[in-house]
Structure formats: C-alpha cells, structure tokens
C-alpha cells in the first residue's frame, strides 16, 4: 500500500497525458492537413488552372494566332512562283520553303520558321503552331503537336503533353 500507490501514480498519470497528447497531435492536425488544404488544392486552384488559363490559352492566343498573324501573312509576304501563296521565301500558302507559311500542299504546311510542314493546316516542322509538327509544332515550344490532329498533342513546351 505505502509503496504501491506512490509508484503507481507517477507511472499512470504521465502515461495518460502522453496518450492524450498523441491523440491531439495525430488527430486534429491530420484532419486539418487532409481536409482543408486538400479542399483548397483540389477545388480553387484546379478551377483556376482549368478555367481561366485554358480560356486564355484557347481563346485569346488562338485568336491572335488566327487573326493578326494570318492578316500579316495574307497581306505582306512575297510570292516566289506559281499561284497565290506558293512561294519559296516568304510565301503564305502552297509551296513555301523558308520563312514561309507552307512547304507544299494545302494551307499551312511549311518547313523553316513556318506554320506547318506536310499536308493540311497546322502540321509544322519548325515554328509551327498546330498539328503534327516536330519543332515548334508539337515537339518544342508549340501549342499543339506531334501526330494526331486533335487539340493539344504536344511533347515539350506545348499546351498539352500528349
């Protein structure tokens, strides 16, 4: 009795305190860390990342790429040979080679510093904007990219990865 009680008290009370303290550290903070921050990280930022930036990337820049540059390409570039836009340097359509909008074929197929390489609209090799381009048209620094004609297939620096 005399020896048992004083020994039991110092052992029991600190253990009870330790258990309560552990529950405080592992229960409430974990709830805060897993509930509120996740709500912030998964709700508001995703809304911002998927709503406003996509609106900017898909609306305004595309409008700029389709409106102003096309206006420049339709007005200013020199025609080297053939019909409208089939130029060697600075051509806008058809068969442009360097610094032009197209290399051969239809609208927007270009080689160097151009909009696209072979085929239809926006398949670029260097500096292209859409389609199945290699550099600047899906591989490096492009908005759309490699292979499929669907929206947002880029590899490096594109709006979408694949």
Swiss-Prot record:
GO terms for molecular function: structural constituent of chitin-based larval cuticle. Keywords: Cuticle, Repeat. It comes from the Eukaryota. Coiled coil: none annotated. Sequence repeats lie at residues 27-30, 43-46, 59-62, 75-78. The keyword Coiled coil does not apply. Signal peptide: none annotated. The keyword Cell cycle does not apply. The tetrapeptide (A-A-P-[AV]) repeats found throughout the protein are also present in many proteins constituting the protective envelope of other species. Component of the larval cuticle. This is Larval cuticle protein F1. The lineage of its organism: Eukaryota, Metazoa, Ecdysozoa, Arthropoda, Hexapoda.
């Amino acid at each position: 009795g005399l020896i048992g009680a004083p020994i039991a008290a110092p052992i029991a009370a600190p253990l009870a305190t330790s258990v309560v303290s552990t529950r405080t550290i592992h229960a409430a903070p974990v709830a805060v860390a897993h509930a509120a921050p996740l709500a912030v990280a998964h709700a508001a930022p995703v809304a911002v990342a998927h709503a406003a930036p996509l609106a900017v990337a898909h609306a305004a820049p595309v409008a700029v790429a389709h409106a102003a540059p096309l206006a420049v390409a339709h007005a200013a570039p020199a025609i080297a040979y053939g019909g409208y836009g089939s130029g060697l340097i600075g051509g806008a359509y058809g068969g442009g080679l360097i610094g032009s909008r197209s290399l051969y074929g239809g609208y927007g197929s270009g080689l160097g510093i151009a909009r696209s390489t072979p085929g239809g609209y926006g398949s670029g090799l260097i500096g292209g904007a859409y389609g199945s381009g290699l550099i600047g048209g899906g591989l490096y620094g492009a908005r759309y990219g490699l292979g499929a004609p669907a929206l947002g297939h880029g590899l490096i620096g594109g709006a979408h990865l694949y």
